Amino acid sequence: MSRVCQVTGKRPAVGNNRSHARNATKRRFLPNLQTHRFWVESEKRFVKLRLTAKGMRIIDKKGIDVVLADMRARGENV
């Protein structure tokens, strides 16, 4: 399973660890992914999504129906 948010599309980013001596070693910044079930009243079913905490806030703000419509318009399988 890839580490990509289904709502925002956020992926792992690449950067550096920096020691006290400012030595750089490569590292990955991973998105804060959670698996969450949402009840979709219009479809009378649960939808299971893998999304970031930011994606959950977007669903709280816009509503699950609007977000699912956007995802389906992008071609996401839901």
UniProtKB/Swiss-Prot annotation:
GO terms for cellular component: cytosolic large ribosomal subunit. The keyword Phosphoprotein does not apply. It comes from the Bacteria. Residues 1-25 are annotated as: Disordered. InterPro entries: Ribosomal_bL28, Ribosomal_bL28/bL31-like_sf, Ribosomal_bL28_bact-type, Ribosomal_bL28_sf. Keywords: Ribonucleoprotein, Ribosomal protein. One of its GO terms (molecular function) is structural constituent of ribosome. One of its GO terms (biological process) is translation. SUPFAM superfamilies: L28p-like. Belongs to the bacterial ribosomal protein bL28 family. This is Large ribosomal subunit protein bL28. It comes from Vibrio vulnificus (strain YJ016). The lineage of its organism: Bacteria, Pseudomonadati, Pseudomonadota, Gammaproteobacteria, Vibrionales.
